Amino acid sequence: MVGDVEQDSPIIPVPCEVVRLAAMPLHKFPVGLWKQLRLREGICSRLPRHYLRSLEEARTPTPVHYRPHGVKFKINPKNGQRERVEDVPIPIYYPPESQLGLWGGEGWILGHRYINNDKLSKRVKKVWKPQLFERELYSEILDTKFTITVTQRTLDLIDEAYGFDFYILKTPKEDLCSKFGMDLKRGMLLRLARQDPQLHPDNPKKRAAIYSKYKEFVIPEAEAEWVGLTLDEAVEKQRLLEEKQQLDSCLPQSDSS
């Protein structure tokens, strides 16, 4: 009878991609939050508040390779309808050598071009790079001349800031895009905070005039020491400070009597 006959169900093949996706573990928190969550545990949570605040309150870099719309809506000239527009930054690659100079926020743009500018021909990869110059720049605060790789945009920004030191001190880290620039800023802020007498030791009037010129940028020395440090450098600095405090607490304290 038909009811006594067992019919095998058809076997449906499962793609390997589905099996791999099913085997992937589910994370408790989104991957995008991992960097922020790292700052809340372990030695990272014991970093100074002003340093953690500088990591959490990262601002949007100033547009360099594209022109923002500046508005959320625009009128379409073809149909007269209001349409939403969005600023989409161009992805920029900052090579390691950009951290050793001052490129003014410029970097490499990775893209494609058509052979002989013919849209019917093959597309090939292309990298657009900024034009670089070697210039000697002088710092009043550090009283030192630096030979730095710069772009024309950097030179224009220095002129707009009315000086090299003003450019370094006024420009946020998101626009400097340079480890060398942040190290310079830390050195300048430390000298301003300490009112270092080694600056023009034979000319106190000139030294006082320089410190007065940049007095608006003075911050406590304890904060200036952390300016421009990467997270790894800050963690190492915090570890050494904690080890020093632990050693000091273990040393016997001599009685003053």
Residue ranges with predicted function:
Residues A22-S256:
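Compact, Lys/Arg-rich rRNA/RNP-binding cores from ribosome-related proteins
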Residues M1-L21:
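N-terminal amphipathic/basic-hydrophobic helices that include classical n-h-c signal peptides
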Residues G3-D4, D255-S257:
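A positional/structural detector of protein chain ends, strongest at the extreme C-terminus
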